[in-house]
């Protein structure tokens, strides 16, 4: 019996070590013991859920050795006041499904790392997509600078690596434009805004999709990518792997939204109609960086506060 218990412990340690190597995680000896224990706790939760759940979880992703409380501290796109903005009804019949990835209009998955900069990744992913759709270009090489927005949008109401809103990013781009990644590389840290960087793209405005209106969000997605915000605080979201995600504990009211992402389409997954949502946590999280979120019931608030840039242009 003792030998069997030892074998279980070794197997678990190997699993943890493999995860740490894959995710480039390094810990002190004492911290490693704690992280392994959390990893094993999460692995047990994943195994239990996957036996009964309608979608799949995994401990492959970057947050497998974090408690849910620790993970939630990373979610920085929080709202303290109601936002106003131009709301537009498209009033068009959207197609049954849309997936801009299949059209080559979605740039590769990015990784925001430990910086609370999701608001820059969600908003710029939508801008990149709409530039590709409306003005052309190569999805594999188009890369706008999130660092530019992290460092330079404080006067617009954002807070660097401690969170912000995509609408503030768009306000900045309307006036100043946004640089290329190669001219203003991502460091995932706060620093002073560089004012001598050449802008590569600009917008003339942005539009808010009518709140909680799934038909209008589909219509907006039929024309291009949309910046959306969600409640990502659940352990199930933290450890999501694949399938049609839904969670009754997840909130969809405006002030519960805490993570900004980008919707790239919608379609049927495992028999359920879902939004196709692009995250900014690298390809190791979720379904190669994506999550399929059930449309019915406005899961986690996808349709609560969507917006997209207008008048997109290269400079």
Swiss-Prot record:
**Looking at the UniProt record for this protein, which Gene Ontology cellular component terms does it annotate, in alphabetical order?**
extracellular space; lysosome; phagocytic vesicle; plasma membrane
Record field: catalytic activity = Hydrolysis of proteins, including basement membrane collagen and azocasein. Preferential cleavage: Arg-Arg-|-Xaa in small molecule substrates including Z-Arg-Arg-|-NHMec
Q: What highest taxon heads this organism's lineage?
A: Eukaryota
Give a GO biological-process term. Answer: proteolysis involved in protein catabolic process
Q: Which EC numbers characterise this protein's activity in its record?
A: 3.4.22.35
Q: Which Pfam families match?
A: Inhibitor_I29, Peptidase_C1
| PROSITE patterns per record | THIOL_PROTEASE_ASN, THIOL_PROTEASE_CYS, THIOL_PROTEASE_HIS
CDD domains recorded: Peptidase_C1A
Propeptide stretches in the record: 14-93
Q: Where in the cell is it found?
A: Cell membrane; Cytoplasmic vesicle, Phagosome; Secreted
| Root EC class | hydrolase
The active-site annotation reads 118, 259, 279
Which cysteine-cysteine pairs are annotated as disulfide bonds in the entry? 115-161, 152-193
How activity varies with pH? Optimum pH is 5.5 with azocasein as substrate, 7 with Z-Phe-Cit-NHMec, and 9.5 with Z-Phe-Arg-NHMec and Z-Arg-Arg-NHMec as substrate.
- Could you list this entry's UniProt keywords, alphabetically sorted: Cell membrane, Cytoplasmic vesicle, Disulfide bond, Hydrolase, Membrane, Protease, Secreted, Signal, Thiol protease, Zymogen
Q: Name one GO molecular function term.
A: cysteine-type endopeptidase activity
Gene3D superfamilies from the entry? Answer: Cysteine proteinases
- What is said about its interaction partners and assembly? Interacts with cysteine protease inhibitor ICP1. Interacts with cysteine protease inhibitor ICP2.
Give the family, as the similarity comment puts it. Belongs to the peptidase C1 family.
> What name appears for this protein in its UniProt entry?
Cysteine proteinase 2
Name of the encoding gene: CP2
């Amino acid at each position: 019996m003792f030998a069997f218990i030892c074998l279980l412990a070794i197997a678990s340690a190997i699993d943890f070590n493999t995860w740490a190597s894959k995710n480039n995680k390094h810990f002190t000896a004492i911290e490693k013991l704690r992280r392994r224990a959390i990893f094993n706790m999460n692995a047990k939760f994943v195994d239990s859920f996957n036996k009964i759940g309608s979608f799949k979880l995994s401990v492959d992703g970057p947050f497998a050795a974090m408690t849910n409380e620790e993970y939630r501290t990373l979610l920085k796109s929080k709202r303290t006041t109601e936002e106003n903005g131009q709301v537009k009804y498209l009033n068009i019949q959207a197609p049954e499904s849309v997936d801009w990835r299949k059209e080559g209009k979605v740039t590769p998955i990015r990784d925001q790392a430990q910086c609370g900069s999701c608001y820059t990744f969600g908003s710029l992913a939508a801008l990149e997509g709409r530039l590709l759709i409306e003005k052309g270009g190569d999805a594999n090489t188009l890369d706008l600078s999130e660092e530019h927005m992290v460092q330079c949008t404080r006067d617009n109401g954002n807070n660097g690596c401690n969170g912000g809103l995509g609408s503030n990013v768009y306000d900045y781009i309307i006036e100043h434009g946004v640089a290329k990644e190669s001219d203003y590389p991502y460091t995932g840290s706060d620093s002073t805004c560089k004012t001598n960087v050449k802008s590569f793209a600009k917008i003339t405005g942005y539009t808010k999709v009518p709140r909680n209106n799934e038909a209008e969000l589909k219509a907006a997605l039929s024309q291009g990518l949309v910046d959306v915000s969600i409640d990502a605080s659940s352990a199930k979201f933290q450890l999501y792997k694949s399938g049609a995600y839904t969670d009754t504990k997840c909130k969809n009211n405006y002030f519960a939204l805490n993570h900004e992402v980008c919707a790239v389409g919608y379609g049927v997954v495992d028999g359920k109609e879902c939004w196709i949502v692009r995250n900014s946590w690298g390809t190791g999280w979720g379904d190669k960086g994506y999550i399929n979120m059930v449309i019915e019931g406005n899961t986690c608030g996808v349709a609560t506060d969507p917006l997209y840039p207008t008048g997109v242009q290269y400079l």
